[in-house]
């Protein structure tokens, strides 16, 4: 089974968290699920560099990457990931969704209402407790 090391941005602004929704993917179990934005770490990158790059690629959104919030390991049916989430501060008030179909700014209490990708559930639980 293929394994990926990935990073996720827990972007917080005015006590709300940025959540993005995937479109249709090649796997039904990740299609239209909500997630924290991020992606794979490329060879030669630090996790923080990867996260800043991914948010620029996916959203044209400059961020400052802060401390790690949580690391989760998850096995999907076709691949597994180790994902580290970092608290991030936006450096702009605007962004553009290049890869996702929707976004929401959610207060902590609202996070549990979304249909999350399985790997992101541990991060949501960490933020809500």
Regions found by a protein language model. Give the residues of each.
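Conserved N-terminal beta-strand and adjoining loop/helix that marks the start
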Residues: 1-18, 40
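Conserved hydrophobic "DFG−1" position in protein kinase catalytic cores
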Residues: 11-12, 19, 88, 105
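Conserved Nudix-box catalytic region and its N-terminal flanking loop in Nudix hydrolases
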Residues: 16-57
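Short secondary-structure junctions
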Residues: 58-65
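Active-site-adjacent beta-strand/loop module that shapes the phosphate/pyrophosphate-binding cleft
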Residues: 62, 72-94, 102-104, 108
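Conserved S-adenosyl-L-methionine
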Residues: 67-71
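NUDIX/MutT-family hydrolases
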Residues: 87, 95-127
């Amino acid at each position: 089974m293929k394994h990926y090391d990935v990073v996720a941005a827990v972007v917080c602004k005015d006590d709300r968290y940025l959540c993005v929704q995937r479109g249709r993917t090649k796997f039904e179990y990740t299609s239209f699920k909500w997630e924290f934005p991020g992606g794979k770490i490329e060879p030669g990158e630090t996790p923080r560099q990867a996260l800043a790059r991914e948010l620029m690629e996916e959203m044209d959104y400059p961020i400052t990457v802060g401390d790690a919030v949580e690391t989760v390991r998850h096995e999907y049916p076709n691949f597994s990931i180790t994902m580290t989430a970092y608290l991030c501060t936006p450096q702009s008030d605007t962004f553009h969704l290049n890869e996702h179909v929707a976004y929401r700014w959610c207060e902590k209490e609202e996070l549990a209402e979304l249909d999350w990708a399985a790997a992101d559930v541990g991060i949501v639980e960490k933020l809500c407790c």
